[in-house]
Swiss-Prot record:
It is found in: Cytoplasm; Cell inner membrane. Belongs to the RNase E/G family. RNase E subfamily. Endoribonuclease that plays a central role in RNA processing and decay. Required for the maturation of 5S and 16S rRNAs and the majority of tRNAs. Also involved in the degradation of most mRNAs. Zn(2+) binds at residues 404, 407. One of its GO terms (cellular component) is cytoplasm. InterPro entries: NA-bd_OB-fold (IPR012340), RNA-bd_AU-1/RNase_E/G (IPR019307), RNase_E (IPR028878), RNase_E/G (IPR004659), RNase_E_G_thioredoxin-like (IPR048583), S1_domain (IPR003029). HAMAP family: RNase_E. Its cofactor is Zn(2+); Mg(2+). SMART domains: S1 (SM00316). The gene is rne. Binds 2 Zn(2+) ions per homotetramer. This is Ribonuclease E.
Amino acid sequence: MKRMLINATQQEELRVALVDGQRLYDLDIESSRSEQKKSNIYKGKITRIEPSLEAVFIDYGMEKHGFLPLKEISKNYFPENYNCDVRLNIKDILREGQELIVQINKEERGTKGAALTTFITLAGSYLVLMPNNPKIAGISRRVEGSDRIELKELLSSLKIPEKMGLIIRTAGVGKSIKSLQWDLSLRLKHWNAIKKASKKKSAPFLIYQESNVIVRAFRDYLRQDIGEILIDNPKILDIAREHITALGRPDFINKIKLYTGEIPLFSYYQIESQIDSAFQRKVRLPSGGSIMVDTTEALTAIDINSSRSTRGADIETTAFNTNLEAVEEISRQLRLRDLGGLIVIDFIDMTTISHQKIIENKLREIVREDRARIQIGHISKFGLLEMSRQRLSSSLGESSHHICPRCTGTGTIRDNESLSLSILRLIEEEALKENTYEVHAIVPIEIACYLLNEKREAVYAIEKRQAGGKTIIVPNKNMKTPHYLVSRIRKGEQIRSMSYCLSNVRKNKIFNNIKKEIVDKKHKLNSTLTNISLSDDSFDKQKEEKEKFLRKKNYNNSIINALFNNKNLFFKFIVWIKNSFLKKHIFVKNESFKRNIFQNKKNILFAKKEEFNSIEEIHKKDNQVSSIDNNKKKQLLNKVKKNNNHQYSHVFDNNTKYTSLKKIDFQKNTIDFELNSLNFLKKNNFYIFSKYNFLYTKKYAKNKFKDFENIKSQNDMICYESFQKDLENNTSFKKKLLYNIIFNNCYPNNILVNINSTIFQIYKNSEFFKFFPIKISILMTPLNIFSLELILEPSSKKCSSFKENQVKKRLRINNYKKLNSSFIHKKNNFVKNSVLWPKKFTTEEIKINHLYKKNKKNTKSYFFETSFKYKTVTKNISKLKVKLTSKKNDYLISNQKKLFLNKTLKKENTKNKSSAPITKIFSDVFLSKNQKIMNSSIFLKKSNKKIKNSAGAHSATNFSTSPVKKSE
């Protein structure tokens, strides 16, 4: 028994299947993402007339204009008194801007617009009305014999209006004249409503939309041989009963039933696997053979293969049986896939002509059940049969498939070697053109590896012939073969860019095609080096609070305010120090620093002062740290020198005070005023300097109160002394120190911070210094460490923080620290929990000049072998030699990325230096949302000799999925 199965369990897709027992022979799928437009009626206007095509283009409200040929234009739109016997000229018939009522005859396909017609067809249950085509009046071609004679008599009895055509459908067989006249009256009302609606509005707009898949299925597929209609959705069941009554098919109401089984409807009738075969290229035959279906722009090719088929006594019989079996499957697949247009079938060669005739007749007999019009030819001497099938709607592949972006629908791609050689030839062609400055090639990683390794000599030869020009090859992991992009940069069309994480890279206008959000991440923005608090409040809120209290006037700091009145001179001095001294002597001359810079490794540590976001008593100038005099003799850090054993020694100048980095642990809780100040005097104190941004603790060897007034600053550095014994025993002295302390030759605007949340302000030339107890919690971060290149380039905002936690005492080092590092910036967790572990200790005696005693004092130096853990990657670092000047509270501070502990730098072999292009592939983390890439042009400028003989500086970034085209 034949059934109509309607599956509506998924609201995005509604499927209608026609089955004969458990064999699927027709399928219609309607999806919410692909709405059918065929048979829709629009009011459009002519936008362009093409006499060469004898057609016009119609704007009917869609993106692509419709195509209307002259043969599809009704005479109702011809001018009056036009002589149709003369050769027609489309410009004499129609004009631009003229409005027409059109119907979609063929839907859009690829780049082609929809095919339109002015011959409107209104399909009903029993007949089809053509209101503006009087030439057509007849009966469906499927009706034969006595039924056809009977319908002709009924057709002559129908009252058809003038200048209208009519076709009686197969469903009209056996119906009375009254039923046919009732259906005709409905179609006439429909046409009158369309004409009335078209006059209310100007073109373009939609007048009538074709019914949904359920109505179309009832109208087109319902025949008397359909035994039952099963629907698995109660809501669709009610809608189906309403539509079938409106269509005038009350005889099918009792056949509509609700399916309530536990097994899905299509699975129960075992048709899911048959539906899947309609999406496959290869379809198996029961005997073991197969058919291959390939659709192209011009036609659909179907190839028949015997495969494992062994049916038949000889090869001729096997070929005949396989072809006969394939004919039935081909006719079914044409209906399931809804393939239209030209179809070519390649049969297995048969020498017997009678077998060929049987195959042709079998195919003609089977396709009679198809609703589409089909024309079939004969099998040629090459074994090919040509046939055409009417396009009823978009095929299953067009509505549910999309073209592969990699192979563009061909199914094959070019191999890597052939593609690489083709790109190399294109690079050479572009490089040898006149006025060429650079040639950029953005290629997949596989192609880049081949060009930079196998063809490095060829790339270098191209650069030589280019007379100084560069060839930049950029691997892009988001690009897959066979896609690539080769662009030529002319000398007069240079655009500065920060692409590929290189400086001074220039790109042409193709750069504008890259996605905007990716470009913004790579663009260098002017910003300042800021310190962000690790508080619960947002950064914007903290910034607002900071600006609020900075606006408040502090009358206690008039001397400091006077100093900062001349801002230009002060900041020019700071900029001059950075540009002339630090960049010249540290970056350029020091090979270790240059290496680390080009590898984006932050190896030099600097502690940045803390920002007090909630202090009202301290003026803006108080919260800044003044710099000391720029004296080269007092450098805190000299060049890093190499030893024969590949160890690095942290050496200080003899005239510089020996200091050690100490822990700052700001407390959140408010401490009593007297206790706070007393703890400050008893314990170690901290000083912050902005020139080198190092945090130091100063201690005197003298511990007597009588020497206090005689202490003076040495080497232009602020001094302070801990008087533990005297303070503990002299209570009167404690009280006195709560308010002022004698202090000589202090530098202005230096802030002393105690571990108990007390801030001390040093006054210039005042012989005393004050402190301000904080009555609220200070929102402070731990000790902030910044790399040297960030200090020199204030446009960068990336920073990191290090928090120290006490661990057990190990060997001779007291309070050795475990260092945990993390970025302050939110969403910028680049390295998490990098740990510096002590593994090996050795000692040796080193004599140095003591700070305040004339005699010399021996100190100990320790060696550490360290290991950093970056997530799952472990990197071993070379040994570091650090001088410790105190046995108490000395800590080793480390950065999150190798710091001073750079990898062991072996001696450079200049003789065997390769001239190959240098390729650097960076991680996605450098393109994180909040990170600002700094411009390293100054570093590249100082190291031109390193890349002078290379084939080009190469780098890989994930800046875009570049368009695949060649730029001129």
